[in-house]
């Protein structure tokens, strides 16, 4: 009996030791991914590409989001739409038809398999590539785009692991090519106005921000074979964290000059139970349907808190499951006042229009009149006509092409894309460790300390 107990004890002790070793290996792997790696090339902060009289564009992915970009590019001057790629013939045909109807030359078409995009990348008459594919393809395609000598413009998120983030950063530095994650919300009218107000000191010294992606998308679960829900639904069965942080976080980061005088230091994260998607599947699908066989593990509501090196705080939330109105929060609080979105409202102690800071001022027109961003003043009406999330898509693409044609640095660089995207992964790490804090990698390798703040750009 004694020997049996001893054997069981030794077996348990061995299992515990193995568990500790496994945990230490995982911890060491995470620590090594956080530590700055040897620089692969020169920093691309402020990278300016040689001027392009005409920007020649290739598109990888022209389905839901990609087709929207095709539509917007047809309204831009100084661009040629050279080639498009997708695995679905129907969306390719739609994109080609639209381009031709806009009196533009018919683009080359690439399809056939998941790697057909490499044929597009092999062309020598393309300057930039717009990547609008499922998330898992973003980093690999961006890396191959830069390695082919082209600038990469990739949809959100830029990458799905810490290692992928580093690989994209390293490739940009080694090739000296732009990799911009196309965070369109940074170009919304309100976001640009608030950026202008922040730079003019309206809110005083910044203290705290709140960002979110609150967008009920359960209906996408009914997209089974094609469209976004056909692949996005499965991420709710693979991860528990903030799956989609950048729409709210991008603008708040620019307000705070993240990677340009401050940077994210550490994060802690919590998730609610994951209930809503299983309930929706039970209500909307037959019992034997695939959607009812999935195990949904991503908490319906995730809340993460970020601390910056300068001590500022940012709350970031994700909720695409519960029935509630859309919101990105878009709150920025300073020593002199606050702006909050959804609905837009302002309260300031000094420098306002006479209203007490104990009450919200929701009359935005006078604030627009005084602080509208120069970009929106220049092309806002054109953006509203051409559409794209209220015009922000058009402003983003217009600004991208303007910078490339005029030899200016882009407003968002690879370090921004990595820093905003990595919240996805770090929130998961924190949740798996009882919401203990996790450290952000410094993708700039210290260059954030001397990088110039993002200015109020004109046009």
Swiss-Prot record:
Listed binding positions for substrate are 213, 232, 244-247, 326
Q: One Pfam match, by short name?
A: TAT_signal
Leader sequence segment: 1-31
The coenzyme or cofactor needed here is:
NAD(+)
Q: Which domain of life is it from?
A: Bacteria
Record has Signal as a keyword: yes
Q: Which GO terms describe its molecular function?
A: hydrolase activity, acting on glycosyl bonds; nucleotide binding
Q: Does the keyword Hydrolase apply?
A: yes
Q: What class of enzyme is it?
A: hydrolase
The cofactor note reads:
Binds 1 NAD(+) per subunit. The NAD(+) cannot dissociate.
**InterPro entries tied to this protein:** Gfo/Idh/MocA-like_OxRdtase_N (IPR000683), Gfo/Idh/MocA_oxidrdct_glycsds (IPR050463), Glyco_hydro_109_C (IPR049303), NAD(P)-bd_dom_sf (IPR036291), TAT_signal (IPR006311), TAT_signal_bac_arc (IPR019546)
Q: How is it modified after translation?
A: Predicted to be exported by the Tat system. The position of the signal peptide cleavage has not been experimentally proven.
Keywords for this entry? Glycosidase, Hydrolase, NAD, Signal
EC no.?
3.2.1.-
| Residues engaged in binding NAD(+) | 64-65, 86, 135-138, 155-156, 184, 244
**What role does it play?**
Glycosidase.
Q: Which family does it belong to?
A: Belongs to the Gfo/Idh/MocA family. Glycosyl hydrolase 109 subfamily.
Please report the name of this protein according to its UniProt entry: Glycosyl hydrolase family 109 protein
Please name the taxonomic classification of the source.
Bacteria, Pseudomonadati, Pseudomonadota, Gammaproteobacteria, Alteromonadales
